[in-house]
Amino acid sequence: MDRRDFIEKSALAAGGALLAGTGVEALANDKKGKTMKVLMINGSPHQQGNTAVALDEIAKQLKVNGIDSEIVWIGNKAVRGCIACGGCSRNPGKCVFDDDICNRISEKFAEADALIVGSPVYYGQPNGAVLSVIQRAFYSNGASISGKPAAAVAVCRRGGATASFETLNMPFQMMNMPVVGSQYWNILYGAAPGQASLDTEGLQTMRALANNMSWLLKATGGKPAPGRADEPWRGMNFIR
């Protein structure tokens, strides 16, 4: 048995034990009886490109597990970057720039139980537009998504996927969001539109991600992670 086989068999055994112990198969609905939902952001300028292939595969597997999903495309129009004006601190829940997709996406945070962000790789980085959306939406309406499970997906032709994957995960870890993993980094390979559908291992990784996301939502009943709970925030500035 090689290392990968050992890891997979161990993970399957542990997962089976956890499922049996918690009875999560019966928990597709949260305590209010609402079917849980994953918001997925397609951060590609191409609505039906390879990022869509990845998110569609996740959506299909979520449905198998009884979890709803919605894919929101950021579009291919200009998206403003954050200018650190502080307007969202004076008017929480809304970015002062209301002429692009950002506020419409952040409005969907409240009704979502989890978040998945997918992006193509440009020069070893995620698409700049999706980074602008996430930064502004998290600043202005982060309270609505804080503590909810999250995952990132990077799609590339050849290289830069791991760096992009790490960049996309950064905001989640600052918002008390449990980051959901898979059997490998959440990466899919493809150049021409639709070519990622040939990446059989990558597609399996997407399905495993969907299974893990479903398991976590069912195990927690869709309840966000507590973070620091009622403890006041304690900041520290090393510049005196």
Segments the model singles out, each with a brief description of its role:
Residues 1-14:
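N-terminal secretory signal peptides and thylakoid transit peptides that target proteins
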Residues 22-54:
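C-terminal segment of N-terminal export signals and the immediately downstream linker at the start
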Residues 36, 90-184:
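Helix-loop-strand module that forms the ligand-binding subsite of alpha/beta enzymes
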Residues 57-67:
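A short, Lys/Arg-enriched amphipathic alpha-helix followed by its capping loop at the start of a domain
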Residues 65-70, 177:
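A generic structural motif
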Residues 75-93, 195:
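N-terminal beta-loop-helix "entrance" segment that forms/cooperates
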Residues 178-240:
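Glycine-rich phosphate/pyrophosphate-binding loop and the adjoining helix
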